[in-house]
Amino acid sequence: MAYSARLRKAVGAVRATLSAVELCDVQAPEFAQHGDHAVAADAPLVLVACSGGRDSMALAAVSHIVCTSMGVRCGAVIVDHGLQAGSERVASEAADRCRALGLGPVIMRNATVQARGEGLEAAARQARYDELCAAAHESGAIAVLLAHTMDDQAETVLIGLLRSRGVDALAGMPQVFTRSGATFARPLLTLTRAETTGICEDLGVEYWDDPTNGDAVDGELPNDYPLRSRVRHDLLPAIERFAGFNVTRHFAESARLARMDKEYLDQRSDEVMGEAVAAVDRPASSAAVSTDAPRACVAGDTNDSGHGIGLMIGVKRIAREPEAIRLRVIAHALSQAGVNASAAQIAAIDRLVVDWHGQGGVSLPRGYSANRKKHVIRVCQDGAHANR
């Protein structure tokens, strides 16, 4: 069959993404030559995360085409969250459609969603990734492909700006990332939802429409719909009407540029963190502590009870950096210590670096606090500050 322009675009996007995850390194040599070749039973495996919707069914179909041409097995993993009536049937039908396309293995997983403080959407996402990671590890898959499109990227930027701020909010979703040791990739970030719908039509692929997307609802969606659905159904179209141009593409391109900035800032912050921050969690020892060189404290800067202090930040080193790097170093260090600090708390610790005049410490979640003594900021649970 002759490929449509959108199908050719999708094939190119999937092939480029597989190259980005270094799949070319494992391609069988004969598949570089023209002709029909059978994919070996022990060939590397790529999994497509499939919900049965139009985006993931289009990705499943295109990925099978591309993987087969590269000598790579293409399977699917389908996660049933059990949050909607009939979800088991939807998952089963998605599995049948993937098998009909030639994907294999087709892995079915049941997720247990336990909503806590983060809300149901976030809990479902966490449960889904847990199952996807488990499926990748158990099957030996070298990558899991996700079907997020340009529309999803634009929605993610708006959601990020509503919930957060700064370049991280603008950066959207990365094309390739790792989670719990599994590699994930998003090949369709350059394609629109209209294009994935068209690809399903081109290939005669059936799909399921999630009712929580609100596509069939006239007027604004009620507040009990998921935030992403409301952004998709109401906010993006309203911005587009106001702006008079394709804001989906505009936001997606902004995300691509912001991600380049974010990746540089993260890289630079990691370099500074390696020089300025020491994590301390070992048993007590008699090691001397230098207030000017926090890395000398790794051997065991503790209180009398033998509990580690958590973190030490070298003020002289971090003070030489611009504010953007300082704030990032502090935030990353706290995150690695399991402390989820607010922007105001991070800024207050930064003032201990650049505007210290003997002020008291900064209270942090989980009973932690940050206190400065000479040229070192110590971040620890409150009891560990004793006798410092």
Curated annotation (Swiss-Prot):
Database matches in Gene3D superfamilies: HUPs
UniProt keyword ATP-binding present: yes
Disulphide-bridged cysteine pairs: none
Subcellular location(s) of the protein: Cytoplasm
Annotated positions binding ATP: S51, G52, G53, R54, D55, S56
Pfam families in the record: ATP_bind_3, TilS
Xref: InterPro entries: Rossmann-like_a/b/a_fold, TilS/TtcA_N, tRNA_Ile_lys_synt, tRNA_Ile_lys_synt_N, tRNA_Ile_lys_synt_subst-bd
Entry GO terms, CC: cytoplasm
GO terms of biological process kind: tRNA modification
Family in the record: Belongs to the tRNA(Ile)-lysidine synthase family.
Role, per record: Ligates lysine onto the cytidine present at position 34 of the AUA codon-specific tRNA(Ile) that contains the anticodon CAU, in an ATP-dependent manner. Cytidine is converted to lysidine, thus changing the amino acid specificity of the tRNA from methionine to isoleucine.
Name of this chain's protein: tRNA(Ile)-lysidine synthase
The species this protein was found in: Bifidobacterium longum (strain NCC 2705)
Taxonomic classification: Bacteria, Bacillati, Actinomycetota, Actinomycetes, Bifidobacteriales
